Amino acid sequence: QFPVRIIEETEEYTIIQASYGETRKNWKNRISTPECTDFLVKDRKTWEEYKPRLSMNKTRFDWVTARNVYERAKSKGRFLYFSCGVGYDMLQAIIGSERLLIAIAEEPEWIRDIMKSATELLIAAGEEMLSVFKFDGVFYGDDMGYRNASLFSPAAYKEIFFPYHKK
């Protein structure tokens, strides 16, 4: 839970610290996946320092904007849904893709701990939003693949991610 802030801006790109604390470079004049260049969580020690940031609290949402968007969409008869990234997609924003993939293979218990914290946060966030708004649906997205295949084995998915996706 970090405020998004601009670190550097040029005519070609903007570098920001994004909401999970990661440093991202976004190109202005071309379409590209943001280039993530640094992460606050680099190992178990920095994970333990970071972990409390994945606790639910009322400041996680911009309630005024959420209410305005909700009411405007509702007045237009739109399909209203709660949506968030979960699992691999969220974890790569916290520790980075390369570090995450290596840890899936070499330190799965660490990744399970991060998944547990992330899942608890998303469940609490969903419950909080459902206590205030009425949704027509829910969408939990998780991008675990690259072009032609998954980023890790089905066995790793079953062992590490599936138990938390079920929750």
Annotate the PLM regions.
Residues 2-56, 75-79:
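A contiguous, low-structure linker/loop signature
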Residues 15-17, 44-167:
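Active-site loop segments of alpha/beta catalytic cores
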Residues 1-6, 163-167:
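Short intrinsically disordered, low-complexity coil segments enriched in acidic
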